[in-house]
């Protein structure tokens, strides 16, 4: 069994990383606005995170799998992120071009953290049956806690200090991330440099079960883009109070935390593909409910409770399936494909399409589209399960 100390180190990395992301994504637009940037420019800067996720995670993971040092690569990327955050704090008053350059560098560096830490943690949690999903949930929960603590505390702190202090808080969180990355155990997380598997990552991706799995990931996460990018705006247009909007987000993150912590108690009740189908199916109903009941906080709260299944259960099942399909030297690149196809490409497509839909048909149309995409994700998950069974050796 993996000792608690390495798992605690991974939990600390995820706490600080998601704290940094939560702080930046929530309050950076306010800082940019204080610098005199237009809403169009601020929106463009915000979209850079999705654009960099299309290539950066796979690039970092390819490098780590080739040099055989995932943790060391993660540490270098964390150091680069700290340099980018410091440069952003200093360059803020100097012009838009410098701000954009620093943000791009920051997001590119961040692209290493999730796939490399996920792959390294999976190495520590490997069992004869695959990934130990119960212990994985106990570690992953710290990322959710870091996010909600940073967003809540950041609001109170910036209320007192003023938004001008924002970039220095970002610097502090990325300094903490580097410190935690330096504490990660690296001695048992190496693959042979330049080791070549019998098949490459892209060859694995072309297998029907894997291709349908990633198609399901893409459409299910694409459906969630309606939530991440447009939920707050939708409720604001409907006249809901800012406190109510914050409460709705708190409900979602709260049930996410509960699921991750206790997932070992019920995760075995379905197959991994069964969880994918359940998550996408529930998401189909969830986003239809948001479209229909935006004026009812009670019903909206019920839809937010399903975040435990549509995000937390879906994510845990995805990580376990990637662990199964991409072993050994391919593991980091498998995690990177998840980041790229699931959260990079889907974020770009969802942001652009959602913007067009909301502009011409209103925000409710965005959530109806999200419901439709989730239904497609469920069908893709069913196809993935079919091909997985077909490829399994006969008993």
Question: What do the predicted segments below correspond to?
Answer:
Residues 2-52, 210-248:
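Helix-loop boundary and gating motifs at the non-cytosolic
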Residues 15, 84, 95-114, 218, ...:
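Hydrophobic core of transmembrane alpha-helices in multi-pass small-molecule transporters
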Residues 32-33, 63-64, 141, 156-159, ...:
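Interfacial helix-cap and linker-helix signal at transmembrane-aqueous boundaries
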Residues 111-128, 313-326:
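Intracellular juxtamembrane helix-capping segments at the cytosolic ends
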Residues 55-69, 158, 258-272, 358:
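Helix-to-loop junctions at the C-terminal end of transmembrane segments
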Residues 79-94, 282-295:
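C-terminal ends and interior cores of transmembrane alpha-helices
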